[in-house]
Amino acid sequence: MTAVALTSLICALAGSWVCAEEFNAAMNSIAIPDLRAHLEVLSDDAMEGREAGSRGGRAAAAYLSQKLAELGLQPNGDADAYTQTFERGAYRNLLAVWEGCDADLKHQYVLVGAHYDHVGYGTRRNSRGPWGRIHNGADDNASGVSGVLEVAEALTLLDPPPKRSVLFALWDGEEKGMLGSKHWCANPTVPLRDVAMAFNADMIGRLRGNTVHVFGARTACGLRRWTSESNPSAELLIDFSWEMKANSDQFPFVQREIPTLMIHTGLHDEWHRPSDDADTINYEGASVATRLLFSLVVQAANQSSRLEFRKESRSESPADRERLEQPAVPRAPRLGIAWKTQDGQRSGVTLSHVTRGSAADRAGLQVGDRLLRLGEQEVADESRLGAAIWAASSPATIVVERAPGEILQLSVQLDGEPLRFGFSWREDMAEPGTVVLVEIVPHSAAFLAGLQVSDRIYRVADRDFCNGDELGQLLASLPSPVPLLVERSGRLQTVVVDAPSVP
């Protein structure tokens, strides 16, 4: 799917409150020079590692408060200030609001957060060493804070603003146990019941393998699909983690049953070391992760209805994911033959193997036979033979040439039922209207189209479906070829399956 098509889809999902060109311009304002500028200030030695309550932490808060004011965001802290102090005034969250445009929905909030503190000079309790040196925390988490500032600036370019208000929260004290986000959840500056969704950007500066990690996609139904449809890059891969750990500022919101997503680009050797410096940042990757965050925030702020928290997400684990995506037991072959690669000189295919006891063996097929016809279909070459075998009715008439000029017509009782497409699926309770492929039959139409196990099917011939039964009815009724909207690792693509008819 092209970037233009993705942008159009995102705007459509967001209710088309702005044109695609305006949305795209706002997204493109998220630029490497601006990300770099914020990140280099926050991770400079002058900030002394931004430990909560320290001189460097206060300097970082002053810089960030100034940037929030320059963007024209409304203060949402104590006494009409950007700061919310806690721990006897030693620590300070920074809070600002961009008001929504909808008369009713603007009283709901999409919270976008990142912690700005780090570990200062490092100790044995919070550093992987060496200790006593400035830990600049460029990735952890100057990168996330810089991304949130860029999202805030991009939102100010949209006219009108999104329907819901967006609350930007820069947390203090995360490295001391998520103190800032915990304090805010216990002492919210907007009613907690009005927070429709929360986002957390933590360590988004070290994109590798073009893969971003998203946590929390099971905290509401449909979030994986929602995230994939918001992916602004046709190249970006998304790893949807099922882990639910108390390891960053999204967790206090999960505890309060608020749908939550965290954007993350992975741990690395520099994590919690003095070497986590600005020159190690993948700025291009950080801009891609930030654009994904922007797309998600825009969609969350414009949804017509709020997402409901999935309580089951708190107990789900990677082991549950493995069970869902576990490939199905392979099917037994219907005919039981193998054939030689075509030489391009003659029609038909020459059998190189006949499995003992198989349908082919029972019908009398032999190695060396040249298969010319299967049912009503002439075997011109090997490319579609496998799909034809899987789709054929039984018994089937097979025509072979055994010796030059010796043509035989055999009746074969094929094993198993006909398969038009050659894939099977499971349903995921967290993703209604989606199926997870768990079987791709070798040489089937699905196999030839390039479908893979763990692919998700979202649409069939531009039609949604409610469940697997409805999908099965669609697949049985549509003429070939059949276009499928498929998600693979967070990327959308259209896969066209040339499925033979099943009698």
Give the predicted meaning of each segment:
Residues 23-29, 45-55, 85, 130-141, ...:
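Second-shell loop/turn segments in exported
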Residues 96, 105, 112-118, 123-177, ...:
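Alpha-helical metal-binding/catalytic segments enriched in His/Glu/Asp
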Residues 372, 386-419, 473-503:
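PDZ-domain C-terminal substructure recognizer with occasional recognition of PDZ-binding tails
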Residues 50-99:
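A non-catalytic alpha/beta surface segment that caps or lines the substrate-entry region
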Residues 3-16:
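Bacterial N-terminal signal peptides
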Residues 157, 269-318:
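His/Asp/Glu-rich mid-to-C-terminal helical/loop segments that flank catalytic regions of hydrolases
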Residues 360-383, 446-469:
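Conserved PDZ fold ligand-binding element
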Residues 171-268, 282-286:
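Metal-dependent peptidase/peptidase-like ectodomains
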